[in-house]
């Protein structure tokens, strides 16, 4: 922790501080997690970095099996600028009178495309896997 950070003295209370930083050693969308005592600080190079740092903590809590061991210092950041998935919106046949694969994206032709709950789960999965783009 840097000088000036508040260190909380109650050992029964863990505090997580989220912050954006101007640390140019972090990659774009990168983050650093530092733990001193009961204070854990998640610093992101930008807002996405803070979110990815939080996802790292969520992953560690989920896999801790009752014994939480937060890193004293962990720095991470993406190697690729664009990371994402491609969802193909096409059918296997042409529409009558058309010589190319073109379709209106209507609930009748692509009902799954309009399923809000499914999209929320899918987008959550993209964030959990540190993806930042979706190609349709």
Language model region names:
Residues 1-29:
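Short, well-ordered secondary-structure micro-motifs within conserved domains or adaptor modules
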């Amino acid at each position: 922790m840097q000088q000036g950070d508040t260190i909380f003295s109650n050992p029964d209370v863990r505090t997580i501080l989220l912050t954006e930083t101007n640390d140019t050693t972090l990659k774009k969308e990168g983050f650093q997690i530092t733990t001193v005592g009961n204070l854990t600080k998640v610093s992101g190079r930008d807002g996405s970095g803070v979110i990815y740092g939080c996802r790292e903590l969520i992953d560690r809590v989920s896999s801790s099996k009752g014994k939480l061991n937060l890193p004293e210092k962990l720095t991470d950041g993406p190697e690729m600028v664009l990371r994402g998935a491609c969802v193909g919106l096409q059918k296997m046949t042409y529409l009558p009178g058309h010589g190319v694969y073109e379709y209106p994206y209507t609930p009748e032709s692509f009902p799954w495309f309009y399923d809000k709950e499914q999209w929320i789960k899918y987008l959550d999965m993209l964030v959990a896997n540190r993806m930042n783009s979706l190609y349709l």
